Amino acid sequence: MPYTVRFTTTARRDLHKLPPRILAAVVEFAFGDLSREPLRVGKPLRRELAGTFSARRGTYRLLYRIDDEHTTVVILRVDHRADIYRR
């Protein structure tokens, strides 16, 4: 059963800053592969980001958490790989 995908306010703000081509790829990925298999398409992060996963879309990354109890993927941030881990 596919997971429900939700974007935080910060992630929505990040989406508005993306180039149109990247935005389309991120949205397609989020509601496609990510919603179907969130554990397979991302990798778990460590240290201060433990419990968070990172998935690639070209040179951009999506940071997300998985709520298995409610079958929901919550996308926390979307940004270029050089900037996403800095905040």
Curated annotation (Swiss-Prot):
UniProt keyword annotation of Nuclease present: yes
Keywords, comma-separated and alphabetical: DNA-binding, Hydrolase, Nuclease, Repressor, Toxin-antitoxin system, Transcription, Transcription regulation
Disruption phenotype: No visible phenotype in culture or upon infection of mice. Significantly fewer persister cells are generated in vitro following exposure to rifampicin and gentamicin, but in infected mice no differences are seen.
Pfam families: ParE_toxin
Coiled coil: none
Entry's EC annotation: 3.1.-.-
One GO MF term: DNA binding
Protein family according to the UniProt entry: Belongs to the RelE toxin family.
Function: Toxic component of a type II toxin-antitoxin (TA) system. Has RNase activity and preferentially cleaves at the 3'-end of purine ribonucleotides. Overexpression in M.tuberculosis or M.smegmatis inhibits colony formation in a bacteriostatic rather than bacteriocidal fashion. Its toxic effect is neutralized by coexpression with cognate antitoxin RelB2 (shown only for M.smegmatis). Overexpression also increases the number of gentamicin-tolerant and levofloxacin-tolerant persister cells.
Protein name listed in UniProt: Toxin RelG
Origin species: Mycobacterium tuberculosis (strain ATCC 25618 / H37Rv)
Gene (name only): relG
